[in-house]
């Protein structure tokens, strides 16, 4: 798939803009704070209805405006697909082929993107929430039912935590009803995640062996807050964990176990990658990003769109080369950069946009 054109109305520092893209490599060149990343963010937003930079919808909207609209024309093997997202006072409106989508899980997945930004380099040493977010975003694109199950789980979790925090007299029977709902959706979430990581690991191992010149083997472990000796007994294990933690939950007024507390661990030659070098961290993250591309291609039979937000300068020549090899394999790619000096071995057929104070040339 590739994004043929993008139209922005009241998005960040773009009052009105329309851009036609190359089906291969597109480079946004300009100094910092000119609007390069805003364009990548708008493409990411068009695909996933969210930003990789902020949680607040208000941050998207152009100064002194009250709404925004991002539209794109997507080319896929099945044909041309118009996509639209609007943010208004009434909320968020998503459309595919000009038809309104009632649920986010109906919209997300129409356009698949893989983002590689400097903050992704914190994936290894950063907080568990970063790694859970990584799973949620990538898995949600290729398995919409995961988003529905995760949304239901988070709804019950919020309800349970609110009840623990605000009720003067806890009804143990009502809490048990909430527990059963939490178990139902929580088990689905964990099973989706385990299946995803198993598939991702296969491609990531292959990429990491190539990057490390066959010196390092990468493995990925899912660290569950609920014991996972047997996937078939996960429901009973979750139920037992909630029962054991009930006194703790009542005292702390929150839920101590479940997929919202889970984590991922990465190992290089069976040693925790958290203790590896900065170069090894970069190799692991690069392997994961390249593996995401292969996994999405394998499942959807379409290439995702690759977004590289000022990340090339973070990679040495060897890692840049591995990334550029992927770009040359007919994957539409968007790169933001302040200079072309560190971009070597680029394909000849590219499109360069010069960005200055929100103006595109």
From Swiss-Prot:
Name the SUPFAM superfamilies for this protein.
P-loop containing nucleoside triphosphate hydrolases
Entry keyword Isomerase? no
Is ATP-binding among the key words of this record? yes
Q: Where in the cell is it found?
A: Cytoplasm
Keywords from the named record: ATP-binding, Cytoplasm, DNA damage, DNA repair, DNA replication, DNA-binding, Nucleotide-binding, SOS response
Which NCBIfam families has this protein been placed in?
Answer: recf
Q: What is this protein called?
A: DNA replication and repair protein RecF
Q: What species is given as this protein's source?
A: Streptococcus gordonii (strain Challis / ATCC 35105 / BCRC 15272 / CH1 / DL1 / V288)
Q: Give the classification, highest ranks.
A: Bacteria, Bacillati, Bacillota, Bacilli, Lactobacillales
- Give me the gene this protein comes from: recF
């Amino acid at each position: 798939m590739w994004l043929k054109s993008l139209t922005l109305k009241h998005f960040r520092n773009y009052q009105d803009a329309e851009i036609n893209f190359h089906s291969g490599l597109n480079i946004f060149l300009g100094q910092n704070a000119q609007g390069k990343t805003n364009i990548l963010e708008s493409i990411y937003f068009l695909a996933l209805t969210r930003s990789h930079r902020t949680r607040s919808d208000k941050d998207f909207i152009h100064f002194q405006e009250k709404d925004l609209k991002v539209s794109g024309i997507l080319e896929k093997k099945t044909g041309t697909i118009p996509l639209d997202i609007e943010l208004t006072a009434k909320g968020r409106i998503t459309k595919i082929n000009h038809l309104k989508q009632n649920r986010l899980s109906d919209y997300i997945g129409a356009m698949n993107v893989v983002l590689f930004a400097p903050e992704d380099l914190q994936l290894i040493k950063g907080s568990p929430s970063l790694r859970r977010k990584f799973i949620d975003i990538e898995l949600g694109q290729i398995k919409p039912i995961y988003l529905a199950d995760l949304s239901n789980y988070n709804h019950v979790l919020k309800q349970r935590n609110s009840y623990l925090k605000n009720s003067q007299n806890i009804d143990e029977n009502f809490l048990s009803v909430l527990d059963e709902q939490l178990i139902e959706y929580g088990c689905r979430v964990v099973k989706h995640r385990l299946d995803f990581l198993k598939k991702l690991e296969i491609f990531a191992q292959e990429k990491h062996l190539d990057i490390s010149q066959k010196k390092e083997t990468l493995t990925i472990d899912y660290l569950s807050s609920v014991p996972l000796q047997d996937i078939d007994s996960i429901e009973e294990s979750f139920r037992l964990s909630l029962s054991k933690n009930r006194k703790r939950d009542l005292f702390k007024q929150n839920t101590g176990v479940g997929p919202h507390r889970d984590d991922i661990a990465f190992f290089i030659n069976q040693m925790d990658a958290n203790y590896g070098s900065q170069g090894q961290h970069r190799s692991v993250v690069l392997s994961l990003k390249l593996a995401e591309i292969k996994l999405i291609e394998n499942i959807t039979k379409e290439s995702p769109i690759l977004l590289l937000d000022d990340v090339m300068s973070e990679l040495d020549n060897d890692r840049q080369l591995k990334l550029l090899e992927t770009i040359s394999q007919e994957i539409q790619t968007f790169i933001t950069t302040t200079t072309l000096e560190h971009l070597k071995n680029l394909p000849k057929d590219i499109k360069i946009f010069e960005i200055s104070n929100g103006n595109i040339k």
